[in-house]
Amino acid sequence: MSGLLKDKNIVVMGVANERSIAWGITKSLYNAGANLIFTNRQERSQTKLKKLLDKHNIEALALVNCDVESDDSIVSAFAEIKEKVGTIHGLVHSLAFAKTEELQGEYADTSRDGFLLAQNISAYSLVAVTREARKLMTEGGSIVTQTYLGAERVIQNYNVMGVAKASLEASVKYLAEDVGKDQIRVNAISAGPIRTLAAKGVSGFNEKMSVIEEKAPLRRNVDQDQVGDATMFFLSDLARGITGEVVHVDSGYHIIGG
């Protein structure tokens, strides 16, 4: 896939560590020739990311602070990206958060604050980020976010995050309609369970991975590299006719009825 994204400037939001889905995406995009811009919420996170990039000999076009809970921070971040890079051609939204206590027990016990927090970071952030990113996508482009089967079905303990992901998937469709006139595509990857830092907070996560190995058509779990390659496809011109879609990268588990 070398050269598939040559000369494309792509913003990646959500790299926390080497286990992050966003890190798998980073590797795929870099190997395809993309110029990468990264956003992080805090200086400390940015320092960790610099070390990670250096370790893997990946050169970033820019590192920018961005707190997606703040509209001002988002506006400032994309103003900085415009100043440093100019035009961008793609954006990876790999951001989600819910309080650990909301990811166990019954969904009916979800707190108001916990519900709003999950929606704000996991779903509304895509709306706010798209609003600013489209201003820099003067040549068209592609936006890809990450979702999960819990948006479509009841997954035990996924609770408030499942509802947030459902909101995210609906937003993908509405945003695809809004920015399509600018030749910008918006799609989502629904990945199977992957051992990320965020996944540790979901009660019973290991059991979910075992079920995939037993019941999915391919009888195996997916990894961050497979999700990375699928995301790279959506960001490339190979997917130029696709928008508003949610594509499952889960070894086919989503087709199984029980």
Tell me what each language-model feature is.
Residues 2-38:
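Canonical Rossmann dinucleotide-binding motif of NAD(H)/NADP(H)-dependent dehydrogenases/reductases
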Residues 14-23, 27, 96-135, 139-181, ...:
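Catalytic loop of short-chain dehydrogenase/reductase
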Residues 50-52, 181, 191-217, 256-258:
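A glycine/serine/threonine-rich, flexible loop-to-helix segment
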Residues 53-72:
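Rossmann-fold cofactor-recognition segment
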Residues 180, 185, 242-244:
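Short, small/polar-rich loop/turn modules that mediate ligand/substrate recognition or access, typified
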Residues 185-195, 235, 248-250:
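Conserved SDR Rossmann-fold cofactor-binding beta-strand/turn motif
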Residues 216-227, 238:
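A conserved structural motif in NAD(P)-dependent oxidoreductases
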Residues 232, 243-258:
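Short C-terminal tail/terminal secondary-structure segment
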